[in-house]
Amino acid sequence: GGFVHRYLLFNKDAPIVKAVAANPAFVTLPDKNILYPFGLKGVESSDKNIKHWVDKNMAILLGEDDLGPRTKPLSNGQMARAQGLNCLERGKLLYNKTRTKAEELGFDFNWELITVPDVGHDNYKLAPFASIYLFGDVEEK
């Protein structure tokens, strides 16, 4: 999830129709007062980056039981913990802060927040929900 949302932030011409950022361990917020990779301070970015970012069709996909602490230094450091105690909180923060920033700037916001009950930090169990977002429900076809 971390790679996907950052890739779209910094690659305005990314050949993406839809994307899924699942259970990011920490997030890059659209805030120039927070040091990168937790915010945009110290990197070249502008409101145009944010416009292209929020214009992409992207789902923030989160397991509702992804409540455990992260163990790697970058995702368990002070800056990451300031974003929330776990991936569920951090993913919701990314969605909400980015939606608010888009509204402040008058940009369309084409993201979706999808939470999945009874799933933790488990890509295998989240994959069917990502597939439905990306390709539609197979049973509908």
Tell me the role of every PLM-derived stretch:
Residues P15, K56, F107-F109:
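Residue-level signal for beta-strand positions within conserved beta-sheet cores that form or flank
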Residues V17-T100:
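The feature captures the conserved acid-bearing segment of alpha/beta-hydrolase catalytic domains
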Residues V4-K12, F129-S131:
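Short glycine-enriched nucleophile-adjacent loop
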Residues G1-G2, D65, P117-D122:
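Short, internal active-site loops enriched in acidic
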Residues G1-Y7, V17-A19:
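A surface/extracellular/periplasmic glyco- and lipid-processing/surface-interacting theme
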Residues F10-D13, D47-H52, E103-L105, E140-K141:
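Surface-exposed acidic, glycine-flexible loop patches that form ligand/cofactor-binding
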Residues Y95-K141:
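C-terminal catalytic histidine-bearing segment of alpha/beta-hydrolase fold enzymes
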